[in-house]
């Protein structure tokens, strides 16, 4: 766009210069410098008619700004131009001065350009309003003005949107303690706190009242079988149990002798029985003579049975007769019901616990013992019952029973053959075939029944006697009573 305007501006400049030169040629005389015209009266006085002369107050006395421009030169090079600028507030609103005002611009400061009006009117006459000129082209942008004064504060704006929450600030210092407020409403009971650490032990308190009887504790684990105690004193006889059911009827025993007892006393006369029925009359016989009594005839046949009368009341009991012979033993009856448990008997005497144990070791000076002899275990680890004889290096059995024996032997430089001996009989053997500077362990364990007076020891066989001991390696021999034999009281 600026490239297109450049030729147009150059052409317009040439036309203006040519027109100016022609106008200067037409002028015959040179006008002198123009003096400022008399100013119109102030707005409180009425406007004067054109052509009349009136006396006016100097513009400087009433705040009129007068400016004479000498440097401004128009296109006429021969004559100088002069202009006078007055404030529009000096003149009445009815005074028309729009002749020199550009179109679209309101009343304000105006300038009289005498170069364009000297052909039409004199300098002393105010110009008349002419027809509006054509709209001029848009001028170049003006120089940016200076910064204006700060205007009055505007009305408060609308409330802005809520901003995003800010970050947590640094914790401030602890403030002063405020005044105590009114007591608040009691809060809800909080949860039980965690158990605190144990505090220091307090002083012993006074003896309290005896507490209530506690609940019975849980049943303990069954204890080991103890040795049988001595027989306690017999308890009191328990209550008689209920009679058992009748046993099975035994077989009939042999008939016992029935000797006659002494005659009892005569019983009292019983009451007469009822009268029997009347019999049929017999056939009358003839009158015979009395004969001699004959011999007793045989017993006749029993007559017909008659109905037995009702028995009379029993008579008084007679004296007891003699005891008859015992009959045969009957079969065993059924088992009766269990009787009521008797009272607890008195506590018996406590049994004496029998103890026997030992544990011995080998000193380094006793390494590689001679074969066929008891190994010299002189290092006593446990021998409170003194059942181990360190002089003979043997265990003496004091209480008969079951024993447990074990040995742990360090083997070095030589092979080993060891045996557990009971009364000269080798009960247990161990072998370790080792040569050189290597170190090994040989061990064994056995459960044996011993009687009082038996002896037990450990020995090596032939030249296999690699039993070794040092400050860092031990060889030990141990035994203990598992349980003793029962003793008869």
Curated annotation (Swiss-Prot):
Residues 290-310 have a biased composition (Low complexity). Residues 1-23 form the signal peptide. Residues 145-204, 205-255, 264-323 form the Collagen-like domain. GO terms for molecular function: calcium ion binding; extracellular matrix structural constituent conferring tensile strength. Its main location: secreted. Gene3D superfamilies: 2.60.120.40. GO terms for cellular component: collagen trimer; collagen-containing extracellular matrix; extracellular space. Residues 27-57, 133-335 are annotated as: Disordered. Residues 351-488 form the C1q domain. Pfam families: C1q, Collagen. Homooligomer; disulfide-linked; probably forms homotrimers. Interacts with otomp. Collagen-like protein, which provides an organic scaffold for otoliths onto the sensory epithelium of the inner ear. Acts as a scaffold for biomineralization by sequestering calcium. This is Otolin-1-A. The lineage of its organism: Eukaryota, Metazoa, Chordata, Craniata, Vertebrata.
